[in-house]
Design a protein with these regions (language model features):
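Ligand-binding beta-strand-loop-alpha-helix segment within the catalytic cores
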Residues: 56-128
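Short glycine-rich anion-binding loops that position phosphate/pyrophosphate groups of nucleotides
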Residues: 38-39, 69, 135-138, 144
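Conserved small/polar residues in nucleotide/adenosyl-binding loops
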Residues: 153-156
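Short Gly/Thr/Asp-enriched flexible loops that form oxyanion-binding sites at enzyme active sites
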Residues: 43-49, 139-150
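N-terminal glycine-/serine-/threonine-rich phosphate-binding loop
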Residues: 1-32, 110
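Glycine-rich N-terminal segment of FAD-binding domains in flavoprotein oxidoreductases
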Residues: 26-52
Length: 156
């Protein structure tokens, strides 16, 4: 692991964009796991700008939505789905066959997790994951706790 220390949010966003574009340059068909929230927003904007200059770089990669709030409609503006479609998937015009997304209101949340796991089992591992750390230390929907849970889970 390499730790990068950046002096500002803009510098962090630029560095993250450089890492993602470098990885895409080496492996265009990679799977990128995308988080939502304040941390990655500027990086997504920079990637969209880069895609206007180098569209071929973004022509094969797959986006996996990291997580989703349960029990609300997918078109609700507060979903991770809405965020990713507004800031990343939509502006990059990622086709549905290269966008893997949890449903926000499945009848069976465990079956939905299994559906995503089966897709990943077929496709292969995640190549790069974009994560931020929330103000209280949370990562994704994993709130601070005495231990980490390594298996997939549904949070309601």
């Amino acid at each position: 692991m390499r730790i990068e220390i950046c002096q500002s949010y803009e510098a962090l966003s630029l560095k993250a964009k450089e890492i993602v574009t470098s990885e895409l340059g080496q492996h265009k068909a990679l799977t990128l796991c995308a988080a939502t929230g304040g941390s990655p927003t500027r990086m997504y904007e920079l990637l969209v700008e880069e895609a206007s200059r180098q569209p071929e770089l973004f022509s094969q990669f797959t986006v996996l939505k990291l997580d989703e709030w349960g029990g609300i409609p997918m078109d609700h503006p507060g979903t991770c789905e809405s965020y990713l479609r507004n800031y990343f998937v939509g502006p990059l015009q990622i086709p549905e066959d290269r966008y893997i997304a949890f449903q926000s209101d499945p009848e069976n949340p465990e079956a939905e997790c299994e559906r995503i796991q089966q897709i990943l089992d077929q496709k292969g591992p995640i190549d790069i994951c974009i994560l931020g750390i929330g103000m209280n230390g949370h990562i994704a929907l994993n709130e601070p706790a005495p231990s980490l849970h390594t298996d997939r889970k549904s949070v309601v």
